[in-house]
């Protein structure tokens, strides 16, 4: 049975790091769909309403449903802007969606950003512009992840939640 893990939250919250660790934990054949890779690297478009990444992300979620046991969708993925992706995911995966929202204070995300390899690409000003406080989705039933949880704990919690349902 196919499962979808959705990791959402503001820039610098640890989504990509957790997605990569989950991919290693689940093993080969686990599909990671990174909003940054699709939007910034593949299409090179701004994150604005109706951007070209939305249908491609949707198509990749569909591909994951058809070809991967576990698909991980990660990114800022603003709740209002990416509703189309979430709605299609809900149609495909039903109750096999494990959605998490990294609900961290801005200062924590800024601190974490300073440890990233791409820290020189953008800074505090851009992160403040992109910031959305508690941007939970109406479509996804998201479990909050707070600053007190460490990466290993997050990975194991999600891994066991998915395996328990398998």
What are the residue ranges of the model-derived segments?
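Hydrophobic anchor at the beta1->P-loop junction of P-loop NTPases
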Residues: 7
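P-loop (Walker A) phosphate-binding loop of NTP-binding proteins
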Residues: 10
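ATP-binding Walker
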Residues: 13
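Walker A/P-loop
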Residues: 16
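Conserved substrate/cofactor phosphate-moiety recognition/catalytic segment
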Residues: 20-66
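Glycine-rich phosphate-binding loop used to anchor ATP phosphates in small-molecule kinases
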Residues: 52-94
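Conserved phosphate-donor/acceptor-positioning beta-strand/loop module used by diverse small-molecule
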Residues: 93-112
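Small-molecule kinase domains that catalyze NTP-dependent phosphoryl transfer to phosphate-bearing small molecules
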Residues: 115-157
